[in-house]
Amino acid sequence: MAATLLDVCAVVPAAGFGRRMQTECPKQYLSIGNKTILEHSVHALLAHPRVTRVVIVISPGDHRFAQLPLANHPQITVVDGGNERADSVMAGLQAVAQAKWVLVHDAARPCLHQDDLARLLAISENSRVGGILASPVRDTMKRGEPGKAAIAHTVERADLWHALTPQFFPRELLHDCLTRALKEGATITDEASALEYCGFHPALVEGRADNIKVTRPEDLALAEFYLTRTIHQEKA
């Protein structure tokens, strides 16, 4: 069945290991409550009616995913990823070749709010480029001296934003920009950076700062707090 303009597919790169978590288990498979971080992240996407399919990109030797209920979900597709995030995203894009618009969401970002997701998806009505969820920088930012634990100078924060996910783009545009950036050896830290490299300027859609990525051990407790609070608010 051909995708409609309103239908959105999501790609969730989940092939990473996350060594900064200091655990043997990949961070996306750590549990918060009765679900893994990956399950929380994916369910937040599937909760929106426009998201019709989620492609989860795992490492070829991953045996954990098959044990999750997600493995049998009718809206889930699983594909093998590559060595780098961009390679995994490309693999995910290949699996949704008919999609008009795609979301890319971190596997270890479980605290996405539905209001933020709805605002991001709404930009497809008027944009040909897409955009990302982002949070304005609130702290004073310092640039360090190369190779030293010393301050080089203070960075003006007026126009600085923390890039979050999901990031939301026309599927063909993202595919073409990633293809060119990878071919030309550009440094791609997120999907938006591939579009920037090709001269596009994705929109910044302000999102909640509690949409954190679980990267370090202390992030796990914080994510659990945020998720528990959200569940209680939804039940109130």
Curated annotation (Swiss-Prot):
State the Pfam families in the record.
IspD
Q: Where is this site: Positions MEP for the nucleophilic attack?
A: 157, 213
Q: Name one GO biological process term.
A: isopentenyl diphosphate biosynthetic process, methylerythritol 4-phosphate pathway
Q: Establish whether keyword Nucleotidyltransferase is in the entry.
A: yes
Keyword annotations for this protein, in alphabetical order, are:
Isoprene biosynthesis, Nucleotidyltransferase, Transferase
Pathway listed for it is:
Isoprenoid biosynthesis; isopentenyl diphosphate biosynthesis via DXP pathway; isopentenyl diphosphate from 1-deoxy-D-xylulose 5-phosphate: step 2/6
For this UniProt entry, the molecular function terms from Gene Ontology, in alphabetical order, are:
2-C-methyl-D-erythritol 4-phosphate cytidylyltransferase activity
Which residues are annotated as site, described as Transition state stabilizer? 20, 27
Provide the catalytic activity annotation: 2-C-methyl-D-erythritol 4-phosphate + CTP + H(+) = 4-CDP-2-C-methyl-D-erythritol + diphosphate
UniProt EC number = 2.7.7.60
**NCBIfam families with a match to the protein in the record:** ispD
User: HAMAP family of this UniProt entry?
Assistant: IspD
User: Which PANTHER family does this one have?
Assistant: 2-C-METHYL-D-ERYTHRITOL 4-PHOSPHATE CYTIDYLYLTRANSFERASE, CHLOROPLASTIC (PTHR32125:SF4)
Q: What does this protein do?
A: Catalyzes the formation of 4-diphosphocytidyl-2-C-methyl-D-erythritol from CTP and 2-C-methyl-D-erythritol 4-phosphate (MEP).
State the family it belongs to.
Belongs to the IspD/TarI cytidylyltransferase family. IspD subfamily.
* Subunit: Homodimer.
Q: What is this protein called?
A: 2-C-methyl-D-erythritol 4-phosphate cytidylyltransferase
Tell me the organism: Salmonella arizonae (strain ATCC BAA-731 / CDC346-86 / RSK2980)
